[in-house]
């Protein structure tokens, strides 16, 4: 039996040297089954497992070899290397210490000694950055740690957790799923998967994952905190929505504001809460605050079409037509619908109208002013700004008053004529078409002759 086992080992060595590690593994296993008390066979198979990156199995074999032969130096070397690859700093240090006790001048683990020191420093740096929520730094330093300890599931999952906090949920999920394939009962992996669901606005499934992690590990504090946060956020969002639907807008505003304080990292949820609060602001007349909320939504998610359309509407209501046009143009790039095309067309028309003279404003009347109100307004303003009243003023003041007098006449000429007024209200550029030869003095004389007779006269109060 021993002879056959030795032959198996030799064949295994040949396959190992040829880098046929799977074949070598089978041959070493055959040798072990024939001679289970050989520390060397376990040592060889441990080396083979290491080449296959199966550090857990390699560590098991190396430790078994040590139990069979406590003076087996190579086995301790392999334990140190495996512990280092698995991120077990204490295990690696103990193995290195034993090797040096067996052979004080041994150069076998010089690199590993340096790597252990570096890994310990990296762990401290990672923890400090994690505590201050500097998650990008954590990922950076964990990448360095994983170069030393590539099989450390703890490092992988902590990196995945931080990636989730950074919104890189696809990457985080890939890591978590990979770990779960190795260990389906990993509470940390299930926790990370729950985080990814939570940060992609799937609170219900997130809660289920946190509860599953707690079933596997009742003391899993992160899952406890996240389950509580999920439930609180879900409840507050639903409460805010209920208050909004029932018209209790100011109460809804308070709830949405409080909900936004729960987790600044949850961009998907916060963008919805901000959009909902923006809607509330429009209902209570706080259009500028609504725009600020929409700005924050679009900073979190530039593709959030509803926020873009709401901001455009607020700009339009505030007569900030250029901003409204810009928003509708961006919205049209995201979704080319007939409704958005119509909104853009209307905004451009409103912008064009806004650049014309505002005859209602010039006369100081409302847009629904009656014919009599328009006449009274013209009479009052024409008398105030008539050039004769300012004959003794400076040249600059006379010029200014003449311009105002002319504009007042133009305004009255349009608003007192039903056809022209209708065209003006519809947005047509009447000024260019019909006002080119307008004479404000003729308008003034005609008005007062019509109002007071052929010999009507008036006196200015200087």
Question: Which positions does each model-derived feature cover?
Answer:
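TPR alpha-solenoid repeat register
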Residues: 41, 75, 108-109, 155, ...
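Residue-level recognition of tetratricopeptide repeat
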Residues: 4, 38, 55, 72, ...
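Short "pre-J" leader segments immediately N-terminal to J/J-like domains in DnaJ-family
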Residues: 199-233, 243, 248-254, 283-292, ...
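J-domain (Hsp40/DnaJ) module recognition
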Residues: 241, 323-368, 387-462
């Amino acid at each position: 039996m021993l002879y056959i086992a030795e032959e198996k080992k030799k064949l295994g060595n040949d396959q190992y040297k040829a880098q046929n590690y799977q074949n070598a593994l089978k041959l070493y296993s055959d040798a072990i089954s024939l001679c289970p008390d050989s520390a060397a066979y376990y040592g060889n198979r441990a080396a083979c497992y290491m080449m296959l990156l199966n550090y857990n199995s390699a560590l098991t074999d190396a430790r078994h070899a040590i139990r069979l032969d406590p003076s087996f130096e190579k086995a301790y070397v392999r334990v140190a290397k495996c512990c280092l690859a698995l991120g077990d700093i204490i295990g690696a240090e103990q193995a290195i210490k034993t090797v040096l006790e067996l052979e004080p001048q041994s150069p076998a683990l010089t690199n590993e000694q340096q790597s252990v020191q570096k890994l310990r420093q990296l762990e401290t740096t990672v923890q400090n950055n994690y505590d201050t929520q500097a998650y990008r730094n954590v990922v950076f330093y964990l990448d360095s740690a994983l170069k030393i300890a590539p099989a450390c599931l703890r490092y992988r999952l902590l990196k995945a957790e931080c990636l989730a906090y950074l919104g890189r949920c696809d990457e985080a999920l890939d890591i978590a799923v990979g770990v779960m394939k190795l260990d389906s009962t990993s509470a940390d992996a299930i926790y990370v998967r729950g985080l990814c669901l939570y940060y992609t606005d799937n609170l219900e499934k997130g809660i289920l994952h946190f509860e599953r992690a707690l079933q596997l590990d009742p003391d899993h504090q992160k899952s406890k905190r996240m389950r509580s946060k999920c439930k609180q956020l879900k409840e507050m969002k639903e409460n805010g929505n209920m208050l909004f639907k029932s018209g209790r807008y100011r109460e809804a505003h308070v709830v949405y504001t409080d909900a936004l304080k729960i987790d600044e990292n949850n961009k998907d949820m916060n963008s919805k809460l901000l959009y909902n609060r923006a809607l509330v602001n429009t209902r209570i007349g706080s259009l500028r605050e609504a725009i600020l909320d929409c700005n924050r939504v679009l900073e979190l998610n530039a593709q959030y079409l509803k926020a873009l359309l709401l901001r455009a509407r607020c700009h339009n209501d505030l007569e900030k037509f250029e901003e409204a046009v810009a928003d509708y143009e961006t919205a049209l790039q995201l979704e080319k619908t007939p409704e958005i095309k119509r909104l853009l067309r209307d905004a451009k028309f409103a912008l064009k109208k806004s650049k014309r003279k505002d005859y209602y404003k010039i006369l100081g009347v409302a847009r629904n002013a009656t014919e009599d109100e328009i006449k009274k307004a013209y009479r009052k303003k024409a008398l105030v700004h008539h050039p004769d009243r300012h004959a003794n003023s400076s040249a600059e003041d006379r010029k200014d008053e003449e311009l105002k007098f002319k504009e007042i006449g133009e305004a009255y000429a349009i608003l007192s004529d039903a056809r022209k007024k209708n065209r003006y209200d519809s947005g047509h550029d009447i000024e260019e078409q019909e006002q080119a030869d307008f004479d404000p003095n003729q308008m003034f004389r005609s008005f007062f002759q019509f109002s007071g007779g052929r010999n009507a006269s008036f006196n200015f109060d200087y």
